[in-house]
Amino acid sequence: MTGPARPFPRHSPGSVGGGPAGPLRTRGGPPARSISKADHPFIGSTGVRPRAESRPMPNASFSTPERIAEELARLNYLAAPGLAAAVFLAMKLRLPLFLEGDPGVGKTVLARKIGEMLGVAPIRLQCHSGIDRSQALYEWDFTRQLLHLRGTPDGESIYRREFLIARPILRAVEERPSVLLIDEIDRADDEFEAFLLEVLEGDTLSIPDYQTITIDEPPFVVLTSNGTREVHGALKRRCVYHWVDHPTEQDEAEIIRRNVPEVAGTPLAAQIATAMTRLRQLSLVRPPGVAESIAFARAAAALGRHTVAEAADDALGVLVKQREDQEAVRDVLRAGAP
């Protein structure tokens, strides 16, 4: 996925979070405020570079990449050494973590596990074609504003927190601590990438007619991409980048055992891992990921099948999502263990 660099589109004048305030415009909101987050075990930043005032990580569990890997393993997520190091560096250097890889390799799951490590549920921003800043940052509740205007004296501000609908980025800034998952950024367009770049570089969020929020302790940000298109290099440069590959056959078998205890004492997990390795070597429309391996193991266990060959026909639907792939996948599964 290489190609010539492309410039970001220019934004209209205004700060991050700007945008049309809508038809109801009343000046005179409260003064700017600062959100100052108290000390907590959360480490992370959306800054473009490590902040000078960064504190050492207070939780000994996160003190080395090896300890990160151990903590993730405790949560049934097996992280390769390079991936554990990327998580550690993103925390230590207070930078966003950019995870890229094929669908189903565990990128989104890792963000959830990081949230578990930090004791929070990740706030997810699901990207899609046409997503804009209002869906990511905030919107005004125009209906409530209009109703309020009808029953209040002239001149009273309708740009107050009670009328502000916080979207994922603003919610992540306001919650303490927080993990912000920006999922499948490759599905968004250049303009939204440019908006995110402004957010990742800034220490404030400006909400016109309301106030400017100073971000003293930003959320830990995880961005994921399936590689369907090239994400702009300027955005990646603000992050710790890691390509998440498929696990080794041995690791995949262990992942299956950890997530599907019903097959832990049988040869089925190893057989499935071997079959998945073979399938990924074929020219399939949609090669199976780890998520499909786990789903197939659960289906086989539910059906009472003890080998891959026995489950080949009945459990095929949880593994294959493209009609063109069915015959090739069925042949590999029916062949069973070597």
Predicted regions mapped to residue ranges:
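Compositionally biased, low-complexity flexible segments
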Residues: 1-33, 49
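Short, positively charged and aromatic/hydrophobic N-terminal segments
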Residues: 24, 35-36, 43-56
